[in-house]
Structure formats: C-alpha cells, structure tokens
Regions:
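Low-complexity, proline/glycine-enriched hydrophobic segments characteristic of transmembrane helices
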Residues: 242-251, 425-506, 539-544
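Extracytoplasmic gate region of multi-pass secondary transporters
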Residues: 36-40, 221-258, 274-325, 422-433
Length: 544
C-alpha cells in the first residue's frame, strides 16, 4: 500500500448523478427524522407515553438503521447497489402504512407497537440506503472523500430543516395532524427512486481487486466485531426483550435467562466473524474508531432526537422548532465547507474532529443554561458547529485508512453509531430526563409527584429504576393556558430535568476530544495523516 495524492476527479461519468441520488435518499431519512422529533409531544399527549417510552420509540429509529446498514454493507459488493435501493424504497413505503395504523382510542400497548415497528422499518430503509450511499460516494471520489462525504451528508441537516419547517408551519401554525406531517417524507422517497433508476454503479476498490468478504473483514477482525456484537447483544437483551415482555407480559423476557440468550447470540456472531477472518485480531486503530463512533452516535443523533423537545420545553414549542431549523440549516451550510477547512486551513480530519468535540462540549453546557431565545441561538450555534463534521468525517477516515475493507468497515461504523444512538443516546437521555425531573419533584413536592408520576417505571442498562412523570399529565400541565400552582411546579421540574440531562450529555464529546487528541499524536508520530491506497492485486486466500 502507498499514500495517494489528493485530486478531485471522479472515477465514473455519472458520479454527480449518483452523488445527488444518494443526497436525496438521505434527505428522505432526515425529513422523516425531523418530523418525528417534532411530533413526540403529540404522541405523548395522544397516547400517554412516558419519556422513556418515547425514547424507546426514537431508539427504534436507530437500531433498525443498524441492521439495514450492516447487513447491506456485507452484501452490497455481492448483490449490487440497485437491489438494495429497491429494498429500501419498499421499506420506506411499508413504514408509513405501519406507523399510520396507530390511532386514537387504541390501547397504549397497541399504539406503542405500531409506532415502534413503523419507526424500526423506517430506520431499516434508511440504513439500507446508507449502506449504498457511503461506499458509493467513497468509491466515486477516492481522492477527496472528506469533502464529498460531507456534501452527501449535508442532506441530513437539510432534511431536518424541512422536517422542522413541516412541524413549525403545519403542526404549530395550521394544527395539521401528525400523520399528514409524517407522510411528507414519501415525496423525497419517490425522488430518490427516480434518480437511482437505470444507473450503472462502480465496484469498490476492494471488490475490484477481487477480495472476498472474509478478506475485507480481516482489518475489522475480532476487535472491531466485538464492538458491534456487544451492541447487538444489548439490543436483544434490552430493547427486543423489553418490547416482547411489554406485549406478552411474560416475565421470561426480563429474566436472567433471556439476558444469557441475548449474549449468546452476540457471541455466536462474533465467532462467525472469527471463522470468516481466520480469527484475525483486526486493526487496533479501527477498533478505536469504532468505539469513538459509538460516542458520536450517542451524542449527535441521540441528542438530535431530543433537542427539539428539550429546548421547546425550556422556552416554547414554537421556539424549539425554530431553533431546530436554525441549527440544522447551519449544519447544512457548513458541510459544504469541509474541503476548504481541510485544504485551505490545512486542518487534518483528526484535527477537525478534535475541534468539533470541544465545541460540542462547550455548546451543550451553554444550551443547558439558556434562558432567552437569543441566548439559545448562540448556544445552539456553538453546538451545531461542533456536531457538523462528526459523522461524515469519521466515515472518510475509515475510507482513507482502510480501503481493503470495501463497504464493510464503513457500514459497520455507521451501524455502530446508529445502534449506539438507539440503545444508549435516545433511551439514555429519556431515562435521564425522567430521573432528574422525578428526583427534583420528589425532593421539593413529594405529594405533587405522587399525583403526576407515571404508572410504569423507566429503566436504563444497569442503573436503578426510576418512575418518571406521566406524559399525558405533564403535557396538560405544560400547555395549560393558566397553570395552577401544582401545574407550574411540575412544569418547572421538567425544565430542571432537561437542563441536568444536557449537562450530563456534554461529557460525551469531552471524552471524544481526549480520544481525538491521542489519535492526532499517533498520526503525527508516523509522519502525519495520509490516504492509503491498494496498489497491487491481492492474492486470493481461503477464509475459513
């Protein structure tokens, strides 16, 4: 392998068409995500969900993505990009039908089932599309991956902007129902289907060299697979066990036996990877990048799922939507500047990630203390700049340094980030909100807490159970035109819970900053950050 020079040309004549088709695909995901973030309050008011239940539904929007992107990443070089695009299109349409089946008057369990599964299938479609788009753009533009992957992922905040505007104009302004709002994500779904239709696709560098799946997995190895398998085991134990227990009432799904079964599944997957790679340990650097991307998913996407709800609670729902649109628009604009930052300012991808982590930490601390709309705009601008380059730049680093992995390492990394957001970020923030709010209200007004507490306790990993506030009662207190003293106390406690949640969340990018600083020193010790290329055909070997 050798270090490649930096150029900007693409390797296929239809590269720009494919780039913008991928842009539209991720745009559809962003619009759906942005609208869902704005209708959480509608779901809480209509069905009485707690913060933890809303967090679990939001979490399904990440875990489904993980399965789509990892499975898609493993098979994409074998079955081709086109078949995965068709599958994603069908999943997107199916998700709308399932989600819309949740209606008022149903039992809470039934509505929860439809919303959870609908969100999961929506995310499955998003993950399948990203299993196409990320390696496709990385292959099309091998000499400037950071720039073009950031352009590709500019569609995510663009989708959030459009989704936020839908909530602001149709939801807050025109009082349009949440189903009509959510159904608008089908418009870009049709557009990306048309854009991809009839196109030819290039092979990844690793696939063109004739590498097998086992060979592509060797740099991932046992270490990299361990990160993904731990999250898969956690999904089976916590989320799948939780939803099966919720609907069946069978205590088995909350028992130690179910936990052992979940971890056995994870171990089995790890053994399969070991067999495919001849039990290669894998790259330590890639292992560190996978772990760090788990933090990226938790802090960026996990926070995105809650930030509109939280800022809308601290200020007003309308202001929360405006702020969400503002930060997303800022991210959209900045992602077109990655080439300028990297080439003109001479900041390496790792240096950029370090700077963003520090801004993310500072921004979240500032957001936790906002009192006014103007102050919120400044604080969220700092946070938005910080989170702008995390996801696409991490993907670019993997594409630059590990070309032998083809689409697999990039897809596993995306899956790890989304799985972390779904299992740790979204539910963790929901649990934190329930916990901090309940603790404050129990301390200051225990009688009011007893009146407003939820019927079902919230759990998160190994932490103690906590009983948050009933979503319907909290929503009534927050939206009352003239609050009673008790309602004001509950609303104030909820705001305090939101502030403490953001403070706790801020420590994640601080840890990331330490990791990126160490990686920066590592690359400096080996002569600087450089793109690695596969120069010669690789001899085929048997992967047992």
């Amino acid at each position: 392998m050798s270090n490649g020079t930096v150029r900007n040309e693409a390797i296929a004549p239809n590269a720009q068409r494919l780039l913008w088709a991928g842009f539209l695909a991720i745009l559809a995901a962003g619009i759906g995500f942005g609208i869902r973030g704005g209708i959480l309050a509608n779901w809480a008011a209509e069905f009485g969900f707690t913060g933890a239940q809303l967090g679990a539904i939001g979490g399904a929007g990440f875990t489904g993505f993980c399965f789509g992107i990892i499975i898609g990443g493993v098979v994409v070089d074998k079955i081709g990009y086109g078949k995965l695009v068709v599958a994603a299109f069908l999943f997107h349409v199916l998700s709308a039908f399932i989600t819309f089946a949740a209606t008022g008057g149903q039992s809470q369990n039934t509505a929860y089932l439809f919303l959870y599964i609908g969100t999961f299938v929506f995310a499955l479609a998003n993950g399948t599309l990203e299993a196409v788009a990320n390696p496709l753009v990385s292959t099309l533009f091998p000499h400037n991956r950071t720039h073009y992957l950031n352009i590709l992922h500019a569609s995510w905040p663009a989708g959030l902007v459009l989704g936020g505007l839908v909530g602001w104009i149709l939801g807050e302004g025109m009082q349009v129902g949440w189903k009509i709002q959510l159904g608008l994500f089908l418009v870009p779904t049709v557009l990306y289907g048309v854009a991809f239709f009839g196109q030819s696709f290039p092979k990844s560098e690793a696939s063109a060299k004739g590498l097998s799946v086992g060979q592509m997995l060797q740099e991932v190895g046992i270490l990299g697979a361990l990160v993904a398998c731990l999250l898969v085991g956690l999904f089976f134990k916590e989320q799948l066990g939780g939803i099966l227990g919720f609907f069946t009432g069978n205590p088995f799904f909350a028992s130690a036996a179910w936990g052992y079964l979940a971890w056995a599944v994870a171990l089995g997957l790890l053994v399969v990877v070991g067999i495919k790679t001849n039990f290669s340990v894998g790259s330590l650097l890639l292992f560190v990048l996978f772990l760090t991307h788990a933090l990226v998913g938790a802090v960026e996407l996990g926070t995105d799922g809650w930030i509109q709800n939280i800022t809308g609670n601290i200020l007003t729902p309308a202001q929360g939507k405006i702020l969400f649109v503002f930060t997303s628009l800022l991210m959209f604009s900045l992602r077109f500047c990655a080439d300028f930052i990297e080439k003109r300012l001479n900041i390496s991808p790792i240096g950029l990630l370090f700077i963003c982590s520090m801004l993310g930490f500072i921004g979240l601390r500032m957001v936790s203390g906002i009192e006014t709309f103007a102050g919120a705009m400044i604080a969220l601008a700092v946070y938005a700049v910080g989170k702008t380059f995390f996801w696409p730049t991490m993907l670019a680093v993997v594409g630059d340094r590990f070309p032998r992995t083809g689409a697999i390492a990039m897809s596993i990394m995306g899956g790890i980030g989304m799985m972390s957001a779904g299992l740790l970020g979204g539910p963790g923030l929901g649990y934190a909100k329930d916990r901090f709010t309940a603790e404050h209200l129990m301390t200051t007004s225990p009688a009011i807490y007893e009146t407003y507490k939820a019927p079902v306790p919230s759990r998160f990993l190994f932490l103690d159970e906590v009983t948050g506030l009933d979503g319907t009662k909290l929503s009534a207190a927050q939206t009352a035109p003239a609050r009673t003293p008790d309602q004001q106390t509950v609303a104030d406690a909820s705001i305090i819970g939101d502030r403490e949640t953001l403070k706790a969340d801020s420590y994640i990018p601080l840890v990331m900053a330490v990791v990126y600083a160490l990686l920066f020193l590592y690359f400096k010790s080996i002569g600087g950050y450089k793109t690695v290329r596969i120069d010669a055909p690789v001899q085929a070997v048997t992967a047992r």
